[in-house]
UniProtKB/Swiss-Prot annotation:
It comes from the Archaea. PANTHER family: BIFUNCTIONAL 3-DEHYDROQUINATE DEHYDRATASE_SHIKIMATE DEHYDROGENASE, CHLOROPLASTIC, SHIKIMATE DEHYDROGENASE. Belongs to the shikimate dehydrogenase family. It catalyses: shikimate + NADP(+) = 3-dehydroshikimate + NADPH + H(+). This is Shikimate dehydrogenase (NADP(+)).
Amino acid sequence: MMPPDYVFGLIGHPVSHSIGQIVYNRYFQKKGLNAIYLSIDIFPETLKYFMSYASKMDGFNVTIPHKISIMDYLDQIDWEARSIGSVNLVKTEDGLLKGFNTDYYGIEYMFKKGGVDVSGKSIVVAGSGGIARTVIHYLIKNNAKSVTVKARDVKLAKNKLNAYDVDIKEYANNDYDIYINCTPLGTEAVGDPFPEVQFGKGKIAVDVVYNPPVTPFLKRAGISGSKTLSGLDLYIGQAIKTLDILTSGCDIDTLINSVRVAVNEVR
């Protein structure tokens, strides 16, 4: 068996829920690319050791909890990622580690595909990590009326999000137009970020979690008559941009088919 020409992967903790290994390896196989994609579980305290060897890989995605802390180890950071303050993709070029944020494109893809315009809307976001920063950046850039963050630790969230003009509260209420989950709650069908909220017609529920595609939060909101947007579309959107950066192009139909196969395999 020939060794791969390119080694890509995902780092995070945990990574057991990720469909990336199935998606990208199937995509590479279908496109005839001699490449491999690995899932690598990296504890926060061992990130610095991994990064000392990271340039041996051709590129890797970054997920919770490393999207912010990884920026300290990179040689270059794309202007969009730097302005957001979060990196979810690293590419090795000429021995240098370059950081990008493809989540932003995934968020844009998800809202456009779902036919949701955030302009003039009052919005609450659960979470204050890297993906929350990216979502907030998108909302402000696209003229949301107001953005509130729901966080368990208000002081910590204020420190993390001090670059943004947002209100931070411990609880949400029924007064918002759009509710967005940017926490791991719902992964593997466990947890609800907005248990205190009563959903109904006219409200929109959005989840960045993609496994499962319909989380308990989205299911509850959908049953109540609210419009729902799945994190699976965010995943597809960011994967399109990821492949553009790592392989200089993306066959969108092949990618979407690979995602569908992966979702069916992990059910």
